[in-house]
Amino acid sequence: MTLVRLSAAALTIALAAPLTFLGARAQQDTNSANYIMLGCEAFLLDPIPTSKLLVAGVCAGIIDTLQAIKPNICLPGISTRRLLVRGVVTYINNNPARLHENFIDLAGEALEQTWPCAKQ
């Protein structure tokens, strides 16, 4: 009976070992600029690739929300969602060492730096 248990334990370990490697791989941070920038860059394409539609919508939605709630962003009279996304993409691409940072924080900073309000 002991031999059967040892064999079963060895088989379980042998079968589970490859799963450990899958779990050990680093999870991708879906809140990082590195991840969401894929959607922002896809948003600027015409048409947006089907495989990137969801993350492109996430990017545009975050940027729309930020420009609506941040009081220190002063957009030009005529501004489009594409213009806002392009501004954020340009800012983040000019700061590649920060791609690991939270996209919302970085996009908010990008909007404030790209379209600051005049000081009173």
Regions found by a protein language model. Give the residues of each.
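Compact alpha-helical subdomains of small soluble proteins
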Residues: L66-Q120
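Bacterial N-terminal signal peptides that target proteins for export
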Residues: M1-L11
